[in-house]
């Protein structure tokens, strides 16, 4: 495990682990959960699941720099089962990519199980996304919006726990206006009883979508950790190694997750670029170094172009706010180039930006736009990215429905119902 201070007691000394050894059916299940966590190596520093963010190349970058466990991007269970193209593009891994959690979103137990069984031999745990607060999750009735249907959640977790060969984990958010956290604690306990063996708690509600606007409730995470007997991971406000240590110390969680801050600084968990207190000591131009290292990994692991572009903007975006000409250069080159030429010119932008950062003698950029204008641009980019992901999901679902309609039409035609086949084929074509 990458270095850092373990919270009081550590994994072996957690109150949950002690209660698990007390015996009884619940205690036996909790003991199994702790055994499963230790079998992973008791990882404390986790790359959180991120749509278009935690793909293989980025996971491997973070592992090089201190992360000791990672989640896949959120995988749509129905699409993973029914759409081969989606399945091939949304999950890739390699032998060094361990321990690894595959995260699924779903609202139907049988479909979730079928999807998970396709991957259970390639991952260490299967995770159920119960925390996504975005509009796409509301429309699809998954993620944090299943907090309104806990009976369905219980059925999904219970089925996975009974049928999979690997442990089941869950990632949740907390209920709003819930102090002293009655609903949240009951939710966590239900998941534990259903068979969840590792629980990640994001200390924000589903209404608190933008992390920059709301502080995470560490007290809620601590309350959950004290209430259940299984290992708990904490998520929220981890921007530096110091934050990770503080969150573990405060909540007693066995580990932490980080998402957006890792996108900007993949060395967030790296002891070598932090001082003894966990304060960052990396050079201002380290963003360029990470970007070029990431490009090498993208070639090695054949990463989709749109994913590369998103990551490059995250790495370099803060300094692009000062150096607009380089942002424009990058924007134009990635749209019109392919292959080795594209990567060469991306590196050229990185090299030029690195020299400018060194020359300016500052550790932070001086944006050309006002804070209000920058905030507006960030909101617009977030909305655009969410809309693009929603459109991709809708298109993939339409392709699945179209294939089903054509298959049903062919079956009807083979049975002598030609008109039915034509109708089904027509319906399928309209779904393209």
Task: Report each predicted region and the residues it spans.
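Alpha/beta catalytic cores of nucleotide-metabolism and tRNA/nucleoside-modifying enzymes
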Residues: 2-46, 51, 56-60, 64, ...
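Glycine-rich, positively charged N-terminal anion/phosphate-binding segment
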Residues: 23-39, 50-120, 329-331
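N-terminal small/glycine-rich loop or linker at the start of catalytic domains
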Residues: 34-44, 78-99, 132, 138-141, ...
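Active-site beta-loop-alpha junctions enriched in small/polar residues
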Residues: 50-52, 75-77, 105-107, 131-133, ...
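Conserved beta-strand positions in the central sheet of alpha/beta enzyme cores
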Residues: 70-71, 101-103, 127-129, 169, ...
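Alpha/beta enzyme core
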Residues: 113-142, 150-230, 245-246
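Short glycine-enriched, charge-decorated loop/helix-capping segments at active-site entrances
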Residues: 141-147, 210, 273-280
């Amino acid at each position: 495990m990458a270095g850092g201070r373990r919270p009081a007691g550590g994994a072996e000394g957690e109150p949950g682990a002690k209660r698990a050894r007390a015996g009884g059916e619940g205690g036996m299940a909790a003991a199994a959960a702790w055994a499963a966590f230790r079998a992973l190596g008791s990882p404390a520093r986790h790359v959180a699941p991120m749509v278009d963010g935690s793909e293989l190349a980025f996971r491997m970058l973070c592992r090089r720099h201190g992360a000791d466990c990672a989640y896949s991007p959120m995988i749509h269970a129905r699409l993973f089962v029914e759409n081969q193209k989606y399945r091939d593009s949304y999950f890739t891994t390699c032998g060094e990519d361990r321990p690894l959690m595959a995260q699924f979103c779903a609202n139907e137990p049988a479909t979730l199980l079928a999807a998970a069984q396709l991957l259970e031999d390639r991952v260490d745990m299967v995770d159920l996304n119960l925390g996504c607060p975005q509009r796409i999750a509301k429309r699809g009735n998954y993620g944090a919006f299943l907090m309104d249907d806990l009976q369905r959640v219980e059925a999904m977790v219970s089925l996975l726990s009974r049928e999979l060969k690997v442990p089941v984990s869950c990632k949740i958010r907390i209920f709003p206006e819930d102090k002293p956290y009655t609903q949240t604690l009951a939710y966590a306990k239900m998941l534990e009883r259903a068979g969840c063996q590792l629980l990640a708690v994001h200390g924000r509600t589903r209404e608190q979508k933008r992390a920059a606007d709301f502080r995470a409730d560490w007290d809620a995470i601590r309350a959950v950790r004290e209430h259940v007997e299984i290992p708990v991971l904490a998520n929220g406000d981890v921007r530096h190694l110091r934050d990770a240590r503080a969150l573990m110390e405060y909540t007693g969680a066995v580990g932490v997750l980080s998402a957006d801050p890792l996108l900007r600084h993949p060395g967030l968990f790296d002891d070598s670029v932090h001082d003894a207190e966990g304060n960052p000591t990396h050079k201002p131009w380290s963003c360029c170094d990470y970007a070029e290292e990431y490009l090498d990994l993208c070639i090695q692991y054949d990463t989709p172009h749109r994913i590369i572009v998103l990551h490059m903007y995250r790495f370099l975006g803060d300094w692009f706010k000062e150096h607009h000409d380089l942002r424009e250069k990058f924007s134009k080159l990635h749209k019109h180039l392919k292959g080795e030429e594209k990567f060469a010119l991306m590196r050229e932008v990185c090299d030029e930006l690195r020299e400018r950062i060194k020359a300016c003698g500052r550790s932070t950029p001086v944006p050309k736009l006002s804070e209000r204008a920058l905030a507006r641009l960030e909101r617009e980019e977030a909305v655009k990215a969410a809309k693009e992901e929603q459109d991709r999901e809708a298109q993939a679902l339409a392709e699945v429905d179209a294939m089903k309609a054509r298959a049903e039409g062919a079956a009807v035609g083979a049975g002598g119902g030609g008109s039915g086949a034509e109708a089904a084929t027509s319906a399928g074509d309209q779904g393209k």
